Amino acid sequence: MTVYVALLRGVNVGGRGKVDMRELKNQVEALGCSDVSTYINSGNVIFRDRRAASTLTRELEQKLERRVAVRSLAQIRALCKRIPEGWGNDQEQKTDIGFALDEPGELLWHALRKDLKPREGPEWEVEVTARNVNTVRTLRAKMEAL
C-alpha cells in the first residue's frame, strides 16, 4: 500500500473553512483508507491506500466537498530534496509550498521577513493549497514513520 497525504484547501484559515479533524479522520476512514491520522488543524491527512492518487483526489473532493491535493510519500520526499536545506519558516525567513490542485507539481516561495510588508505573501498563478516548509517537513517525517 502507498502512504499518502491529502492536503485540503482553505481549512481553518482566518476563522473560515472550519473542519473538525476528528470528523475529517472519520470521513477518510469511511472511504476505506487505513492508518488515517491528521496533523494540526489545517487539513492534513496521512493514510495508506491501494488506489491511485487521481482516484483518491476525486473521491476525497466528492466526500469532503473541498479541493484536495493528494501526494505520495515518494512525491513528498522528492519535493523535500528540492527545498534548499537553509530555507525555513522562522523569525527571519518565510518559505511556503503551493501544491497545485489542477496539475501536477508544487511551487516554492521563499523570502526574508525583513523584506516583506505586513501580510505579504506569495501570489500563486495557479490554484494551490499552501503549507509552510516546516509543516511539509513534519508531514514527511510522519509519513515515513507510518
Question: Model-predicted segments: where are they?
Answer:
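Surface-exposed, charge/polar-rich loops and edge strands
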Residues: 2-42, 46-146
